[in-house]
Amino acid sequence: MIDIVLNTIHKYNMINKGDKIIVGVSGGPDSMCLLHILYRLRDEYNLNIIAAHINHCLRGKDADNDEKYVENFCKKYDIDFYSTKIDVGKLAKKENISFEVAGRECRYDFFNKLKLKFNCDKIALAHNSNDQCETILMRIMRGTGIEGLAGIKAIRDNIYIRPIIEASRKQIEDYCEEHELEARIDKTNLESIYARNKVRLELIPYIQENFNQDIIAVINRMGNNIDVDREYLDFASDKKFYQFCTSTKYEVVIKKEAFLEHKAITSRIIRRSINRLKGNLYNFERVHVEDILNLQKGSTGKFITLPEKIKALNNYGDIHIFFEEFSDNKGENKEKEQILEIGNNIINSNIKVQIELTNEIHKDIMGKDVYVKYFDFDKINGNIMFRYRKDGDRFTSLGMKGSKKIKDLFIDFKIPKHLRDYVPLICFGNEIAWIVGYRISEKFKVEKNTKNILKIKIEGEKENELV
């Protein structure tokens, strides 16, 4: 058994020497086997192991006994132990989700809090090859695609690792018996009350008896084969994502050119965009990908509402995906103004404005960097200001003779409505000198006889965070 685990660890490069690892431990055979094996590898890999247990409050005294069993085991083997109690039944009812989903969410939340608290490297989970088979069969019955057929990943985000994913339940039970681990048994796993239990207790035994005795190994092999193709598609679509998408913590924009790619790539770009925005793909299904694909084919200004208060907007063929509350906060920036000084200025905690006087003009004056601009300092009257648009604002764009309403310019620039109150403006006195990211004013441009040059550079806290 330990050889199977070592082979999996080496194959996927799961663990490095000196890693600090959180191990999710329910007290059942799978997690106790995993914890015991990692304990045996502790000295060889110089591991720091933390056992994490969640009492789901679903099985009364049995659940309390599970927690006590894991705690005592950890004391015996000198393993750090942390536990929490979460009423999964109440959580499921409150969030209108299944017990299974609620349990998974609270487990991952607890594990990640511990990871941050103790600066851990990995989170080890106790899925095995039987779990893999059950998961893939359940996904097939839901009409899954390649992502689902690939099954549970052995390693995800270089954080979540599954060292016993290639071991069977029988091998795990034999290991527990050999080492007298006396793992706890959740009696509900032996009852056909959940869909997964029916797959485990009824469907798989039926297939084994009537079609293929090795169905678990066969399904696992299929998942591994498909995973190779999935990895390539992910690699190809990731490249396209960075080519065609921009993102902030508030929204992701998919350029219209992305929708000229093969549907397999475009679909993955959409999924990647949702994942970038909300951190996961829970409640986001194939039908929502199709909805966004159809939205892009429609007219500008149209939008759809997606799960978890997310909206998608067609803006001249580009698709903007954002949280509803972002668009609902329109106008909150109108009163935000800040006088800027020579040197570094911090705006709203996440935008930095650097201002300096210079006699040199670099190549980026020709527009190569939309967030660095030069102005004739001697033409400036009044304070240098940072603000957002106001009703009645007008602007004389570079090359224009007369002024134009900011509202009309934003339409010309194809800035979607929900972003227009977030476009930064640099003003000199009462005059708008720069619509950041778009245009500078004709009135303050640098000319041949300019003596003193003002250089302004604007940076977001993260890439693409300015608007």
Swiss-Prot record:
**SMART domains found in the cross-reference section:** TilS_C
Per its record, the protein catalyses: cytidine(34) in tRNA(Ile2) + L-lysine + ATP = lysidine(34) in tRNA(Ile2) + AMP + diphosphate + H(+)
Q: Which GO terms describe its cellular component?
A: cytoplasm
Read off the CDD domains from this record.
Answer: TilS_N (cd01992)
What keywords sit in the KW lines?
Answer: ATP-binding, Cytoplasm, Ligase, Nucleotide-binding, tRNA processing
| Major localisation | cytoplasm
Pfam families, per this entry?
Answer: ATP_bind_3, TilS_C
Q: InterPro entries from the xrefs?
A: Lysidine-tRNA-synth_C, Phe-tRNA_synthase-like_B3/B4, Rossmann-like_a/b/a_fold, TilS/TtcA_N, tRNA_Ile_lys_synt, tRNA_Ile_lys_synt_N
Which Enzyme Commission number(s) are listed?
6.3.4.19
Q: Name one GO molecular function term.
A: tRNA(Ile)-lysidine synthase activity
Q: Where in the cell is it found?
A: Cytoplasm
What does the entry give for GO biological process?
tRNA modification
Q: Does the keyword Translocase apply?
A: no
Entry note about domains? The N-terminal region contains the highly conserved SGGXDS motif, predicted to be a P-loop motif involved in ATP binding.
Entry similarity comment = Belongs to the tRNA(Ile)-lysidine synthase family.
This chain's function reads: Ligates lysine onto the cytidine present at position 34 of the AUA codon-specific tRNA(Ile) that contains the anticodon CAU, in an ATP-dependent manner. Cytidine is converted to lysidine, thus changing the amino acid specificity of the tRNA from methionine to isoleucine.
UniProt protein name: tRNA(Ile)-lysidine synthase
Q: Which organism is it from?
A: Clostridium tetani (strain Massachusetts / E88)
